[in-house]
Amino acid sequence: MLRLCFLLSFMCLVKSDTDETCPSFTRLSFHSAVVGTGLSVRLMLYTQRDQTCAQVINSTALGSLNVTKKTTFIIHGFRPTGSPPVWMEELVQSLISVQEMNVVVVDWNRGATTVIYPHASSKTRKVALILKEFIDQMLAKGASLDNIYMIGVSLGAHIAGFVGEMYSGKLGRITGLDPAGPLFNGRPPEDRLDPSDAQFVDVIHSDTDALGYREALGHIDFYPNGGLDQPGCPKTIFGGIKYFKCDHQMSVFLYLASLQNNCSITAYPCDSYRDYRNGKCVSCGAGHIVSCPSLGYYADNWREYLWDRDPPMTKAFFDTAETKPYCIYHYFVDIISWNKSVRRGFITIKLRGEDGNITESKIDHEPSAFQKYHQVSLLARFNRDLDKVAEISLLFSTKSVVGPKYKLRVLRMKLRSLAHPDRPHLCRYDLVLMENVETFFQPILCSKQQM
């Protein structure tokens, strides 16, 4: 709540409504947020035929909405400035580009715009009732609940849940993008989004320590970077307004990345972020569907597998890069050492591709214990995926400021890609790593016995 309060102090004036040829998202001013707004919901339809010019529709006039097609509703959340969401247009265009569908923007800016968050929160059920009235008319015209998909951002995620509850969980799918936490944390299932609200509920948690919901809410819950501080977002209040909203918005930007085919973000089901970082959760156990779940639009490839689980809920973790397309590429670095005594320390690994590109991973979340003839498997994360690795460097460090410098004697090092398990494993034998000295070498193909 503290971050939410600070957010309000950074609000700046935005432009008021103006007449436009094509209907667009309601644009209000900060003055509207201060004096408050009554609830008014506009439904704006976009199709492949009308991708940039919306058509305002309602329960008595469905317009050009094709009830035989998939219909995706986008529901925004709290708007303390009255301005349109910066991501809305891109999300609409990206959805239409991947599949022929109806995209309906649920514009409840008159209602969500207020500096008093509880006032916006109190209107969520009213918005849900309006959406149910509209969907009832869709069903009367021949639509199927199976083809209804709701993407809810922040408060919008709970609105989607309330709609799903009114249809006894028969909606096709709900995606919650960092569902709002304040006033919803700890509430019973009927007062928030939960897995029973749709046939498939997937959730991305990106700001669990401030504006987002802490606990799992779906059949599968994704936690980028543990669901806390997101790379690329300001770490202090000196980052201005971005400090307060960047982590919260990152769920939307990560979802957008899944629609844009720059890379596929893979997540790893795990009990905790710490276990994931320690490399304990890289086998997903669902090879008959996909090796591991993908974040975002294609997360429902895992729905049948999750339905068979008891309970049908899974947490999945992954890390991201600071900038688009946010992908991190995972490798295992398997090290067998032959020191007489245990060596504890950290490994930094660099890869150089045949094209000259270099990428680095610091495996430093906690020290590893290297014991004689025991294999230590380290999960390394790189911002770049190198198809052909020409050179590898390793650096061993105990991070000790005083005391002797140690050696790590490596009997065998093996590098294997998790994203591309079909790639050949690369090895190197009989290395001596001097502490804090980078050691370069050319890898060779591992023998078949060690694949």
From Swiss-Prot:
Q: What class of enzyme is it?
A: hydrolase
MF terms from GO for this chain are: carboxylic ester hydrolase activity; heparin binding; phospholipase activity
Disulphide connectivity of cysteines: C233-C246, C270-C281, C284-C292, C427-C446
Q: Which UniProt keywords are listed? A: Cell membrane, Disulfide bond, Glycoprotein, Hydrolase, Lipid degradation, Lipid metabolism, Membrane, Secreted, Signal
- What is catalyzed by this enzyme? 1-hexadecanoyl-2-(9Z-octadecenoyl)-sn-glycero-3-phosphate + H2O = 2-(9Z-octadecenoyl)-sn-glycero-3-phosphate + hexadecanoate + H(+)
Q: How does it assemble?
A: Interacts with TTMP/C3orf52.
Name of the protein in question: Lipase member H
What are the leading ranks of the lineage? Eukaryota, Metazoa, Chordata, Craniata, Vertebrata
The primary gene name is: Liph
